[in-house]
């Protein structure tokens, strides 16, 4: 089960990815986490990435693909994985497909989360997470059962991302529609795209996602 979750920031991809991980036991692969791990461990590609970052430059698609490739080769990905926040562009999508093909692998499905812009801005403007386990909360939509205590791990420490505000969100959406939304047509043309209503309640979205996964 090799998945890509596609949709604008705030569409609920992270929440649904967590649920897929818990139910199906496949890892959620974030390029940021993979990059930090590769640099920390000091793999060959990690050293290349560190040299680029130390020079204050952006890590190239080539290096990111190499890091994703390296991560997919690890044993916990044998039964599948979820790509989180990647690919972001058509160039990255082509490179990802070529990388998987070289391993004799293929994507199982790409799930698109559809949410209108006004709702996305509202969601992100009130979002915060548990600093310990990363569980996502919202000022009005999802607060901890016990005030100030994470439902999942019991931590009392929470954090808000500096860019989780309306002004920044509007800019992020502009980038998404320019660079990432073309992937919807790309994967539709390949017969890989399935869409869910990201405006629905979280549990209903999960039901839709599981319905898609059950047909794989």
Curated annotation (Swiss-Prot):
Record's catalysed reaction(s): AMP + ATP = 2 ADP
Top EC class for this record: transferase
NMP: annotated span: 30-59
Location of the region described as LID in the Swiss-Prot/TrEMBL record: 126-163
Gene Ontology cellular component annotations, sorted alphabetically: cytoplasm
Keywords from the named record: ATP-binding, Cytoplasm, Kinase, Metal-binding, Nucleotide biosynthesis, Nucleotide-binding, Transferase, Zinc
Transmembrane segments: none
GO BP annotations, alphabetical order: AMP salvage
Quaternary structure annotation from Swiss-Prot or TrEMBL: Monomer.
Protein role: Catalyzes the reversible transfer of the terminal phosphate group between ATP and AMP. Plays an important role in cellular energy homeostasis and in adenine nucleotide metabolism.
UniProt-recorded name of the protein: Adenylate kinase
